[in-house]
Curated annotation (Swiss-Prot):
The gene is rplX. This is Large ribosomal subunit protein uL24. The keyword rRNA-binding applies. Belongs to the universal ribosomal protein uL24 family. Keywords: Ribonucleoprotein, Ribosomal protein, RNA-binding, rRNA-binding. The keyword Mitochondrion does not apply. Pfam families: KOW, ribosomal_L24. GO terms for biological process: translation. It comes from the Bacteria. One of its GO terms (molecular function) is structural constituent of ribosome. One of two assembly initiator proteins, it binds directly to the 5'-end of the 23S rRNA, where it nucleates assembly of the 50S subunit.
Length: 105
């Protein structure tokens, strides 16, 4: 169980796979499996049988979780994928800082 470096609602860029280069938002984080669910990335088609909730059934497109190593945090200040460092502020709070521009994320 690896520590996941992104949080829910973070902006990330996909760095490998069929959606490489796509900038999107993290919808969910699964730390036990080290996976993240990214909006409009890794979209799969699922064949759904008709049931009470979905009378029609059919083919549904939805996002599937991807490994957290395939995404990188996106800094909106320098408009690029970046690594992060942790910094301790004077009031004692820990913040994440962009390695490229030094902006607090």
């Amino acid at each position: 169980m690896a520590k996941v470096h992104v949080r829910r609602t973070d902006k990330v860029v996909v760095i490998s796979g069929k959606d490489k280069g796509k900038v999107s938002e993290v919808l969910a984080v699964y730390p036990k499996t080290s996976k993240v669910l990214v909006k409009d990335a890794n979209v799969v088609t699922k064949h759904v049988k008709p049931n009470r909730e979905n009378m029609q059934g059919g083919i549904v497109k939805k996002e599937a979780p991807m490994n957290s190593s395939k995404v990188m945090l996106y800094c909106t200040n320098c408009n690029s994928a970046t690594r992060i460092s942790k910094k301790l502020l004077e009031d004692g709070t820990k913040v994440r800082v962009c390695k490229k521009c030094g902006e607090i994320l």
